[in-house]
C-alpha cells in the first residue's frame, strides 16, 4: 500500500525536526507511519503527541522523538541488515523497515508479537522476520548484523549482542536501572567503542522469561 503522510503525522515530524532530528529519511518515515495503528483505539487520539504510551502487558510504545533519534543514529552507518530487540507494538519496526533492506525483530511477549506482525502486514512491509524469544540472546543464526537496536533498558550490555555485530556494526542500547543512558557501541575488530548519547527512560529488558 502507498503510505500517505497525514497532517497530524507531518506535524509530529516537524516537531521532531525542531527537537533536533535532522535525517530527512527518518522524518519522512515518521510522517508516513500511522502511529494510531499501533495503539489501542482508546488512545488513538494521543497518537501524534510526542510521548510514550501504554500498549498493555506492562509495555509502552516509545516516545516518537526517541524512535527517531535511535533510528537516526543507526542510519548514520548505512546498515543493510538490522536486529531489533523488543518488537513491542511494532511502531519502531515499521519505521525501520521502511528505511532498511532487512529487519529482524524479537519479542518475548507472544500477544504483542502477533499484533505487531498483523500491523506490519497491513502496512505492506514484507522485509521483516519475526521471532518469539529472549532478546537478551539475540538471533545468532541470522547474524551478524550491521546494526542492532534495543528498545528496553538492559542492566548491562548483553555479550551475545556484541558478538552478533558485524565489523563496524553499531549497537544502539539504553543501559541502566534507575538512571539510564542511551549508548552507541561500535565494533572495531574484537574491541567495542562506546559513546554516551543522552539520558533516557525505558522499560527494563528482561533476561530469559517469555510471556
Swiss-Prot record:
Single GO BP term: methylation
GO cellular component, one term: cytoplasm
Native source organism of the sequence: Shewanella frigidimarina (strain NCIMB 400)
Alphabetical keyword list: Cytoplasm, Methyltransferase, S-adenosyl-L-methionine, Transferase
Subcellular location: Cytoplasm
PROSITE patterns registered for this protein in UniProt: PCMT
UniProt similarity note: Belongs to the methyltransferase superfamily. L-isoaspartyl/D-aspartyl protein methyltransferase family.
Summary of the function given for this chain in its UniProt record: Catalyzes the methyl esterification of L-isoaspartyl residues in peptides and proteins that result from spontaneous decomposition of normal L-aspartyl and L-asparaginyl residues. It plays a role in the repair and/or degradation of damaged proteins.
HAMAP family associated with the record: PIMT (MF_00090)
Gene3D superfamilies: Vaccinia Virus protein VP39
Cleaved signal peptide residues: none
EC number(s) stated in the UniProt entry for this protein: 2.1.1.77
Entries under CDD domains matching the protein: AdoMet_MTases
GO MF, any single term: protein-L-isoaspartate (D-aspartate) O-methyltransferase activity
Subcellular location, principal: cytoplasm
NCBIfam families on file: pimt, PRK00312.1
Gene assigned in the entry: pcm
Protein name per its UniProtKB record: Protein-L-isoaspartate O-methyltransferase
Record's catalysed reaction(s): [protein]-L-isoaspartate + S-adenosyl-L-methionine = [protein]-L-isoaspartate alpha-methyl ester + S-adenosyl-L-homocysteine
Active-site residue list: 62
Main EC class the enzyme belongs to: transferase
Amino acid at each position: 500500500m502507498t503510505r500517505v503522510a497525514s497532517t497530524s503525522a507531518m506535524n509530529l515530524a516537524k516537531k521532531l525536526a525542531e527537537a533536533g532530528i535532522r535525517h530527512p529519511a527518518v522524518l519522512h518515515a515518521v510522517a508516513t507511519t500511522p502511529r494510531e495503528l499501533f495503539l489501542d483505539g482508546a488512545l488513538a487520539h494521543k497518537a501524534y503527541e510526542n510521548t510514550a504510551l501504554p500498549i498493555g502487558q506492562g509495555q509502552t510504545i516509545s516516545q516518537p522523538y526517541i524512535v527517531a533519534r535511535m533510528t537516526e543514529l543507526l542510519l548514520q552507518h548505512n546498515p543493510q541488515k538490522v536486529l531489533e530487540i523488543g518488537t513491542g507494538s511494532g511502531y519502531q519496526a515499521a519505521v525501520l523497515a521502511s528505511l532498511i533492506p532487512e529487519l529482524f525483530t524479537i519479542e518475548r511477549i507472544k500477544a504483542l508479537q502477533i499484533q505487531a506482525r498483523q500491523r506490519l502486514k497491513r502496512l505492506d512491509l514484507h522485509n521483516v522476520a519475526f521471532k518469539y524469544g529472549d532478546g537478551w540472546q539475540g538471533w545468532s543464526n541470522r547474524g551478524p548484523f550491521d546494526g542492532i537496536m534495543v528498545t528496553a533498558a538492559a542492566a548491562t550490555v548483553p555479550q551475545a549482542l556484541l558478538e552478533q555485530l558485524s565489523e563496524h556494526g553499531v549497537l544502539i542500547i539504553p543501559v541502566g536501572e534507575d538512571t539510564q543512558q542511551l549508548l552507541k557501541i561500535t565494533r572495531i575488530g574484537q574491541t567495542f567503542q562506546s559513546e554516551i548519547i543522552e539520558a533516557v527512560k525505558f522499560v527494563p529488558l528482561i533476561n530469559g522469561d517469555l510471556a
